[in-house]
Swiss-Prot record:
Organism the protein comes from: Gallus gallus (Chicken)
Presence of the UniProt keyword tRNA processing in the record: no
One GO cellular component term: extracellular space
Name of this protein: Pancreatic polypeptide
Keyword Signal: yes
Alphabetical list of CDD domains matching this protein: PAH
Length: 80
């Protein structure tokens, strides 16, 4: 039988992993500095916004196209 401290350590680590909130899956949206913000802040905001939009709207390769028919033969081969 394993030592008692090993099982307590395993229990503590698993509870710690459950207690930690999960991270965000993507970047956070930049906050608008306001209409009366200096030009440098507005430039920084628009650059951050462009980078955010590039990440959020990037192409995701490996997904099936919606135009593909489910019953279609692979590689266009004729069925039996």
């Amino acid at each position: 039988m394993p030592p008692r401290w090993a099982s307590l350590l395993l229990l503590a680590c698993s509870l710690l992993l459950l207690a930690v909130p999960p991270g965000t899956a993507g970047p956070s949206q930049p906050t608008y500095p306001g209409d009366d913000a200096p030009v440098e802040d507005l430039i920084r905001f628009y650059n951050d916004l462009q980078q955010y939009l590039n990440v959020v709207t990037r192409h995701r390769y490996g997904r099936r196209s919606s135009s593909r028919v489910l019953c279609e033969e692979p590689m266009g081969a004729a069925g039996c």
